[in-house]
């Protein structure tokens, strides 16, 4: 019985991981119960095949404590030469009725947000992500952004 259960578990694991063949990097980092405006989430990317193209995504886990309809992020890619390309991005996080977008059956949702397409990497890169949310009509940023629990970065190989 124990061998049969182990075999079923192994088969389930193989099926689960084989369904995601495009993934070459996928990592999350926790930001706790609130994402502080000065907290930068950094990912050290692996060295990838420089002849292939990749699609890049910012992944988020959020819950019903997220108080806004959209999200502003500052994403910086640091190249091996030290050059840094910075983008300010806006993503819709909630439907017009206020329910969170994303995948998940509980109050925790996962959102896979498109960042860049057809990117080639030549060497070792770093990605830095910080939140840049502001309340409507206010200049200072939200000090501690509630509702975002984890920030991730994902790289998929282009077909």
Swiss-Prot record:
Pfam families referenced in this protein's UniProt entry, alphabetically: GldH_lipo
Chief location: membrane
Gene Ontology biological process terms, A to Z: cell gliding; chitin catabolic process
Phenotype when the gene is knocked out: Cells form nonspreading colonies, cannot digest chitin and are resistant to bacteriophages. Whereas wild-type cells can bind latex spheres and propel them along their surface, cells of the gldH mutant fail to do it.
Signal peptide: 1-18
Lipid-binding residues (covalent, N-palmitoyl cysteine): 19
Bilayer topology annotation: Lipid-anchor
GO cellular component assignments: plasma membrane
Residues covalently joined to lipid (S-diacylglycerol cysteine): 19
Protein name per its UniProtKB record: Gliding motility lipoprotein GldH
